[in-house]
Amino acid sequence: MRAVWVVFGVVVGGIALPLGWAWGRSFGRVRRVDDVPATGVALVLGAGVRWDGVPSRILQGRLDVAFELFRAGKVRRIIVSGSPESRGHSEPVVMRRYLRARGVPDEAVVLDESGVDTYSSCRTAAQEHDSLIVVTTRFHLRRSIALARRHGIDAHGVGHDAAADGLRRVNARATRREVLATVKAFWLPR
């Protein structure tokens, strides 16, 4: 019976410690468009492209947040980070096209095709930026800010609320996945 409690403690600690890390590193840094400090740069994390080359609904929500930041003057540049191959399309190219249709000039959009995951996106952004606003979905925001800060970026974040857009089932599934991804992120190298 004692071994069961030891295993239970290790499992709970193995989950609680990474979640505490993400919450601690992002404490006070999860903001809204109207109260996030202006940094000049936003990093939009990819979230998939449909087969017809249109951003997924979750990605559209993230891009809409980035557009609002641009329109509010909080950022002058938007880094769109994602996979170069998402259902036959480059995620960053699709993201730029969506932002262009909203009125963001191409010269304000920087493509990062090395963003195959959040860790890679943050690592690449850290090579040129010491502060930025991470734009992702709310369930993904704390881990994203924590990873950006691990790479030396003074990051704040603004999240899109997928549940408010009728994506509750996707949001619930992604939240469960996010716990495991946070555990993984905690153990990744710096």
What is the predicted role of each segment?
Residues 1-34:
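N-terminal type II signal-anchor transmembrane helix
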Residues 21-175:
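A structural signal for short, hydrophobic/glycine-enriched beta-strand patches
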Residues 171-190:
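A transmembrane-helix-recognition feature enriched in membrane-embedded lipid enzymes
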